[in-house]
Amino acid sequence: MSDIKQHYTDFDEYLRQGEPSQKEKASIWQTAIGLQAVDGLQTSDYLKATACKHIEGEINIDEARELITSYYQSKTQREPDDDEKQEADKVSANITKILSSQTLDFSTGGYVSVHRRVFDGVFKHAGKLRDYDITKREWVLDGDTVNYLNWEDLRRAIDYDISQEKVFSYKGISTDVMVEHITRFVSGLWQIHAFCEGNTRTTAVFTILYLRSIGLKVDNSLFAHHSWYFRNALVRANYKNALKGIDYTFVYLERFFRNLLLGEKWDLRNRYLHIHATDEWKVQPKLHPTSTPQVPHK
């Protein structure tokens, strides 16, 4: 790889100075890589170098995916974090392929298909609904868990949420109502937690595809740089504990979507979301004025 391409490995230079096609590819790669943070994963230097080859037009996305697969198949010296990096690398490339397409099957089958495609070559259970109940200890909840849906009703619940969204009309509503509605739709879909693993990444990709499909311009940098906030905001939107005096709160997720869709600048740091935030972190500030809001074409 040349010195120039090495310099561009963080993608920022492509976003600032690249050709339009390079900017688009760099933005998608940055989003795909950033989404790995929801599970504490980091990609390898090899993945970033391969991504640059794709951005430069030297290889297509399928060739990039093949290179990554071959890299791990032929690697002789194993590192302690190879399994995690392999997952992050392969999933990032898979997400890049998905987000490079403008197609979306907005149905239960389409949602399940996104999971299958995101985790193709990574999980044996990719594209399969879970068949057991789950709990997950959350840092933002001080070790407690969200109550996820029981496994017997997963498909029925996804069917219902998507059917309700299909008939919802965005015509004539305010941007505030639009954001509130999108927040609750995405929160409800995520709370189902349809899969054994990879629910947040699947929901994020499906959300990006859906918002684009109804005419909204999505600021990919929000998912690229604040994916863990996105996950923690989903957790807070779906957690209630009467003994602790904690109710469901959508405000943190709404602020993520206000930044994403309206150009607002809420400070998206995770400490504001902790159920026992210190006084310093109790009030989440808005940093800058808004830009011109969007109206969806639906």
What is the meaning of each model-derived region?
Residues 1-298:
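FIC/Doc superfamily catalytic core
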